[in-house]
């Protein structure tokens, strides 16, 4: 952004603040939880709630895996750690394919909580500089939701 004129920067920021993009982190959260619940329905070893708790890490492996280990045990905590690391690796390695086949917002959604830090350079490279602000906003909102969703989903018992 520093190479752009002041007017170009203002236009870039204004265009990035599309009100519809505010819903991207919400849709990422809902889509991830729905996908995990559906996957959990087909697993005999794990409940849909366990799968949703793992998915609610959204790539924030250093925090979610610790919470899940404390609430549900080391086995599910390890699954959460590996699942979140894989989410980040997929976002990093598949960003060009995600943009090509699903659009410029796809790597942001796939990146989950990592979109404001580790996956931001890759997202910027393949989605474009105009997606930096929405990527940071997305990462912040999703990142902020992790401790609340993980602890909530781990504390529910049927």
Report each predicted region and the residues it spans:
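Transmembrane alpha-helix/helix-exit interface in multi-pass inner-membrane proteins
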Residues: 33-53
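Juxtamembrane boundary at the C-terminal end of a transmembrane helix
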Residues: 147-158
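Short juxtamembrane and helix-loop transition motifs at transmembrane-helix boundaries
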Residues: 14-20, 41-47, 67-75, 96-103, ...
